[in-house]
């Protein structure tokens, strides 16, 4: 799949039309998605209509933006007017939003072509996309394995060249972990940089929308298009959005990179450890100074997250009552209707997290669990603050393993939760984090390197990622998917 800039050049030079590019993406989806199952719905008519409008502009010699005519996948937890948004849940099987999310509106305004809504773990709760109420997405590198989650559909779609770029959301690693497992670039921006208006809420203090791409430059272009202040989102940061492509430089001279010591211990696959360490050594050859950094409370991120996120989910998911939207089960009383609808509509993992959250917020347990978890969250942020006094960017493995077999962890929730061990602390601290491909294991499965920046320092992440990418060939590898 060609890059955004190359496609843009072809459109401007009238070498190809937007309709041709879109048709090619739709044909690719048609050819491989029965195996990969990235998309919950393909919006072919909508896509071709958008592409025609872009071609009309070009025919009139009107200027078009970089994203005009570019095929993009949207995770199905972002509201799209008149197009079903299910959040991967049976409870929203028939929900057609009456309004547009801010990010999809920005992409519409830019002329981007949405080719479909991608699969996800139900309500974005999961690390394998096996919790979807509709289908299980496969990893394009090995169809018997998972793509990661919860944005597995978007990651797999980009890896399988079904679209050029895609949007996902990241609450505890849901962009970076699938990016790592699928061998693509995935970025979780600083909390508040991208509007959450129209994103179906899971854990409001952690959720953040971000890009998936085949290369760093495309991720920078897409972030630039969706970032920015939005008065409709009270957590949105009012800050100017730079042109992120200005940070794409081939050298790392003058940058100090910190390796988080605590991430190289127990539970890390030896092949992942070796591959990530080789990538870190490579950063030295690009001019970076590399030092070790200790974040002693990093390991408490996982237990703190599994109190905070379910607590917020318990509150957010209370709105699915079968009265206003979604499915409705017949019952004699209102309470029975709520109970029956939720029993049928919610999957097991969602029920599990609602129950955990309701418990940790209940009288007598609030101080012992929820309040304590919030204090731990502050301590983790302090560890990061101390680290960034010495270094520009922190690095560690994105995921402790490469892609695991479908069904391997479904009966053991704890081992599934451990998939996000190194990504969760970044969400708790509200920092930007990025996963870039840095090699393969013995089964030809991708390994990801995680880069972590200080608040609003996405530019430094792009600089490190781009310099690494341009001096290696991992991003050019494609899955053996016919």
Swiss-Prot record:
Active site: 75, 150, 174
Gene Ontology terms: biological process: translation
A GO MF term: glutaminyl-tRNA synthase (glutamine-hydrolyzing) activity
InterPro entries attached to this UniProt entry: Amidase, Amidase_CS, Amidase_dom, AS_sf, GatA
Keyword field contains Nucleotide-binding: yes
Cited Pfam families: Amidase (PF01425)
UniProt keyword Disulfide bond, yes or no: no
Keywords of this entry: ATP-binding, Ligase, Nucleotide-binding, Protein biosynthesis
Catalysed reaction equations from the record: L-glutamyl-tRNA(Gln) + L-glutamine + ATP + H2O = L-glutaminyl-tRNA(Gln) + L-glutamate + ADP + phosphate + H(+)
Transmembrane segments: none
EC number: 6.3.5.7
GO terms for cellular component: glutamyl-tRNA(Gln) amidotransferase complex
Family: Belongs to the amidase family. GatA subfamily.
Annotated function: Allows the formation of correctly charged Gln-tRNA(Gln) through the transamidation of misacylated Glu-tRNA(Gln) in organisms which lack glutaminyl-tRNA synthetase. The reaction takes place in the presence of glutamine and ATP through an activated gamma-phospho-Glu-tRNA(Gln).
Self-association state and partner proteins as the record states: Heterotrimer of A, B and C subunits.
PANTHER family per UniProt: GLUTAMYL-TRNA(GLN) AMIDOTRANSFERASE SUBUNIT A, TRANSAMIDASE
Protein name per the record: Glutamyl-tRNA(Gln) amidotransferase subunit A
Lineage: Bacteria, Bacillati, Cyanobacteriota, Cyanophyceae, Oscillatoriophycideae
Gene giving rise to this polypeptide: gatA
């Amino acid at each position: 799949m060609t890059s955004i800039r190359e496609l843009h050049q072809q459109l401007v030079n009238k070498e190809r039309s937007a309709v041709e590019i879109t048709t090619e993406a739709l044909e690719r989806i048609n050819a491989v998605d029965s195996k990969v199952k990235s998309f919950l719905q393909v919006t072919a008519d909508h896509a071709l209509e958008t592409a025609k409008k872009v071609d009309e502009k070009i025919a009139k010699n009107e200027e078009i933006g970089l994203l005009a005519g570019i095929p993009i996948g949207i995770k199905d937890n972002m509201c799209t007017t008149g197009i079903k948004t299910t959040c991967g849940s049976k409870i929203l099987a028939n929900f057609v939003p009456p309004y547009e999310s801010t990010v999809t509106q920005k992409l519409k305004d830019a002329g981007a072509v949405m080719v479909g809504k991608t699969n996800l773990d139900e309500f974005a709760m999961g690390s394998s996309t096996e919790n979807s109420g509709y289908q299980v997405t496969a990893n394009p590198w090995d169809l018997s394995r998972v793509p990661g989650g919860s944005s597995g559909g978007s990651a797999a779609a980009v890896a399988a060249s079904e679209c050029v770029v895609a949007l996902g959301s990241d609450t505890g690693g849901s962009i970076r972990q699938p990016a790592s497992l699928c061998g693509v670039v995935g970025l979780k921006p600083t909390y508040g940089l991208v509007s959450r208006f129209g994103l179906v809420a899971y854990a409001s203090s952690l959720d953040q929308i971000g890009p998936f791409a085949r290369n760093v430059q495309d991720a920078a272009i897409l972030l630039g298009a969706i970032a920015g202040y939005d008065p409709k989102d009270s957590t949105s940061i009012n800050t100017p959005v730079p042109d992120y492509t200005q940070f794409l430089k081939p050298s790392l001279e003058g940058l100090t990179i910190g390796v988080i010591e605590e991430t190289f211990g127990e539970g890390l696959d030896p092949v992942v450890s070796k591959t990530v360490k080789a990538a870190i050594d490579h950063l030295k050859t690009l001019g970076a100074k590399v030092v070790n950094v200790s974040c002693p409370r990093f390991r408490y991120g996982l237990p703190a997250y599994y109190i905070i996120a379910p607590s917020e989910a318990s509150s957010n998911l209370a709105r699915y009552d079968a009265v206003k939207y979604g499915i409705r089960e017949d019952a004699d009383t209102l309470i029975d209707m709520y109970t029956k609808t939720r029993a049928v509509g919610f999957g097991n993992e969602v029920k599990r997290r609602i129950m955990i959250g309701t418990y940790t917020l209940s009288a007598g347990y609030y101080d012992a669990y929820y309040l304590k978890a919030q204090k731990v969250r502050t301590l983790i942020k302090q560890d990061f603050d101390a680290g960034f006094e010495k270094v520009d960017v922190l690095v560690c493995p994105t995921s402790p393993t490469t892609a695991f077999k479908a069904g391997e962890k479904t009966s053991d929730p704890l081992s599934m939760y451990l998939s996000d061990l190194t990504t969760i602390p970044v969400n708790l601290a509200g920092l930007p984090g990025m996963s870039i491909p840095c090699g393969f294991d013995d089964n030809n499965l991708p390994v990801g390197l995680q880069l972590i920046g200080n608040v609003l320092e996405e530019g430094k992440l792009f600089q490190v990622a781009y310099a690494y990418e341009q001096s290696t060939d991992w991003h050019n590898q494609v899955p053996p998917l016919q």
